[in-house]
Amino acid sequence: PVLSPYIRHYWILQDDAAVSVSERTFPIGCMQLVFHKGKQLFLQNDLKLQPQSFICGQSIGFSDVLSTGRIEMITVVFQPYATKALLHIPVHLFHGKDVAMDEVEDVELSDLAKQVTDTSDNIVCIRLIEQFFLRRLYAFSGYNLKRMSAVFQEINLQPQINIPQLSEAACLSSKQFGRVFADYVGTTPKEYLRIVRMQRALFL
């Protein structure tokens, strides 16, 4: 409950199928943290494996992934505006990328990745992840977080909202709003609204 304003949900995928399975994934408008405890997935668009544990940035296109063996993965799905509060990094740096946790130069995050991949019990893994983020949250003093929370309330309430209305909800100038939004959400307001509209169209 304490982390619910920051983490939308966790999901765990396990599959021992011997035959490779292909899946098309679409943008969901949220950044994610992915821990592969089994075999990594193969990115068919990029012709490479996903990193073992990585930060998944915002993207606007679909991606085709292929299993390469036994799948066991834990994914943390952040609230759209909350990743910066938990990772302490401007998240626009991850736009369109899957960045290995070891490449972020964050020793605590690398240690978490190792702990999760070395722990067999997934409930214990979730507990380790939550303890890590609670420590991060108490060390974060981002005054723009409440502004971004208000912006996303407006997006959820008004399907056809525009960017000037969002910058007004954030009490920021258009230029300031664009910069703060990218720092917290990992993409531009225009691109994010496009993702939201695509998601709504997919689930109509």
Question: Where are the regions a protein language model picked out?
Answer:
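Alpha-helical bundle regulatory/interaction domains
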Residues: 1-149, 153-164, 168-174, 187-188, ...
